[in-house]
């Protein structure tokens, strides 16, 4: 049987780049890694609390962290930054203060920037959040998948594959359902493929959502 490799790790250095850019001594590496995880969790929790959207989409595509000796630069790529800025005009400053308190940055400055991504529904994380919201509202999974595919078609993507696994529609036996539209060449390294794996808690249990989006070929 074919071995499934993570499409992002498989393409690192060709079409994908790292989301954390910093160097450290081997003995301090694990601390740096934990710090990154905490920063990302803290930002996601803050956005979840302060962003009131009807669809329940946080809209965070990815969070990039660049570290220097005296500075931590955090860039948040969002699909709908307007919603965060409108609900909290001083939201970014508040978030910066919260993070500085949390990490006790005495000798390091922390800087947060928010960047809008051009086509939000061409991003698998935002799409997975959309599907998760639909499944929580007990929309049938096929309907949710089809709606997600319609949204990506508007974002000019070349192909998409969506997979949902678990107790779908509350059935007794867990199963895997998937749908593909267009081309998704997972074996081609020069193909720019974005991928995300997302878990959603429904009343019947946990469902896993995986999304592969074929953006372009280099």
UniProtKB/Swiss-Prot annotation:
GO terms under biological process: translation
UniProt KW ATP-binding keyword: no
One MF term in the entry's GO annotations: structural constituent of ribosome
Keyword Ribonucleoprotein part of the UniProt annotation: yes
KH type-2 domain residues: 47-118
Localization per Swiss-Prot or TrEMBL: Plastid, Chloroplast
UniProt keywords, alphabetically: Chloroplast, Plastid, Ribonucleoprotein, Ribosomal protein, RNA-binding, rRNA-binding
Disulfide bonds: none
GO CC annotation: chloroplast; cytosolic small ribosomal subunit
PANTHER family reported for this sequence: 30S/40S RIBOSOMAL PROTEIN S3 (PTHR11760), SMALL RIBOSOMAL SUBUNIT PROTEIN US3C (PTHR11760:SF19)
Family as reported in the entry's similarity comment: Belongs to the universal ribosomal protein uS3 family.
Record's subunit section: Part of the 30S ribosomal subunit.
Protein name: Small ribosomal subunit protein uS3c
Organism of origin: Solanum lycopersicum
Lineage, broadest ranks: Eukaryota, Viridiplantae, Streptophyta, Embryophyta, Tracheophyta
Gene name, Swiss-Prot/TrEMBL: rps3
